[in-house]
């Protein structure tokens, strides 16, 4: 466990990436190395481990799973409201978000950490479920969740022995929870590149999912085009499970048309190459993109680089000094997700 003195140096994280110069400093700094190393270490830890693998679960893993269970209960306590058939975000998400925010300090008591440390960890936690104002979710929020786990690791809650379970137990449960929230509240995609992106909402199921399959005897990237294999293997492998979900979400068109990037990747010969490519893509398209990283938060344990802009002083620090994306859904021009389209068309969403 991190010393009490060090924990008391923690503070509520704030934005510090306001322009391209700040992004450059981030990519050259300690925070980037911390995040990148953590993602790569988790990736290595989950290689050749299906979701059904027998993996030890520490009490810390159990605590996190229980916290996610509570978030699921909060969702049920804040039902979606009649949104007059709108395909955009349901306002009830804001009540859900507010309750998660209120309960965050209590949920962190189980870790026995100092107040300041809980405040630093807590902001990454509640921000990982989407944006309250825009009622959207994207890879930046997914990054907040990984940052929450990283903060807990920095505090000494997790060790490297926990890494396999952090992916195939905790992260898998988080993705399932987020999928339920996306459906329940019709969350909009944040920063979606549309059909030409990897996915409207998530990136890491593909990265970690490829790692799971690196040395598989029989399964190859081309098998994502085989519906029978997807059906048989979706419960054990994140990558295949996510493609299965996308196919069910968009049943009227082929993978080639609804997810051309995933279809292109299926031509790669080995999962090892896919995994290497996913890591490079994550660095370039998430950690290296200003429209995503301008919303990222820095505290004591994930520190801003020297020379970065000071935190915005007025208003909501997640909204002011916003740098515009070139995509249509930047700055409030709403784009409904495939999930909302499927609900609107009466398609059955494959989630219970």
Swiss-Prot record:
One of its GO terms (cellular component) is protein phosphatase type 2A complex. Its main location: cytoplasm. InterPro entries: Phstyr_phstse_ac (IPR004327), PTPA_C_lid (IPR043170), PTPA_sf (IPR037218). GO terms for biological process: mitotic spindle organization; regulation of septation initiation signaling. CDD domains: PTPA (cd04087). Coiled coil: none annotated. It comes from the Eukaryota. It is found in: Cytoplasm. Its EC number is 5.2.1.8. Keywords: Cytoplasm, Isomerase, Rotamase. PANTHER family: SERINE/THREONINE-PROTEIN PHOSPHATASE 2A REGULATORY SUBUNIT B, SERINE_THREONINE-PROTEIN PHOSPHATASE 2A ACTIVATOR 2. This is Serine/threonine-protein phosphatase 2A activator 2. It comes from Schizosaccharomyces pombe (strain 972 / ATCC 24843) (Fission yeast).
């Amino acid at each position: 466990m991190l010393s009490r003195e060090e924990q008391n140096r923690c503070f509520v994280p704030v934005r510090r990436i306001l322009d391209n110069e700040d992004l450059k400093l981030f990519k050259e700094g300690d925070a980037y190395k911390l995040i990148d190393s953590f993602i790569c270490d988790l990736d290595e830890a989950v290689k050749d481990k299906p979701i059904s693998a027998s993996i030890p679960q520490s009490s810390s893993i159990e605590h996190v799973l229980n916290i996610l269970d509570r978030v699921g209960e909060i969702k049920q306590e804040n039902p979606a409201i009649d949104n007059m058939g709108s395909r955009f975000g349901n306002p009830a998400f804001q009540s859900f978000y507010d309750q998660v925010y209120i309960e965050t300090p209590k949920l962190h008591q189980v870790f026995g950490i100092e107040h300041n440390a809980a405040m630093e960890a807590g902001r990454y936690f509640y921000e990982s479920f989407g944006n309250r104002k825009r009622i959207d979710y994207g890879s930046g929020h997914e990054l907040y969740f990984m940052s929450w786990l990283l903060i807990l690791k920095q505090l000494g809650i997790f060790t490297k022995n926990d890494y396999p379970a952090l992916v195939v137990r905790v992260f898998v449960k988080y993705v399932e929870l987020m999928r339920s929230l996306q459906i329940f509240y019709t969350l909009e995609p944040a920063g979606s590149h549309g059909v030409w992106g990897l996915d409207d909402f998530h990136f890491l199921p593909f990265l970690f999912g490829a790692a799971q399959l690196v040395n598989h005897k029989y399964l190859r990237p081309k098998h994502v085009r085989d519906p029978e294999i997807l059906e048989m293997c979706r419960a054990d492998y994140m990558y295949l499970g996510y493609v299965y979900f996308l196919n069910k979400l968009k049943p009227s068109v082929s993978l080639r048309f609804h997810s051309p990037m995933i279809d292109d990747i299926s031509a790669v010969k080995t999962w090892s190459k896919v995994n290497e490519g996913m890591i490079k893509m994550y660095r370039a398209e998430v950690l290296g993109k200003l429209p995503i990283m301008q919303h990222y938060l820095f505290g004591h344990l994930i520190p801003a680089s020297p020379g970065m802009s000071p935190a915005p002083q007025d208003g909501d620090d997640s909204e002011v000094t916003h740098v515009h994306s070139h995509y249509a859904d930047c700055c409030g021009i709403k784009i409904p997700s495939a999930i909302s389209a499927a609900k609107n068309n009466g398609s059955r969403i494959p989630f219970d």
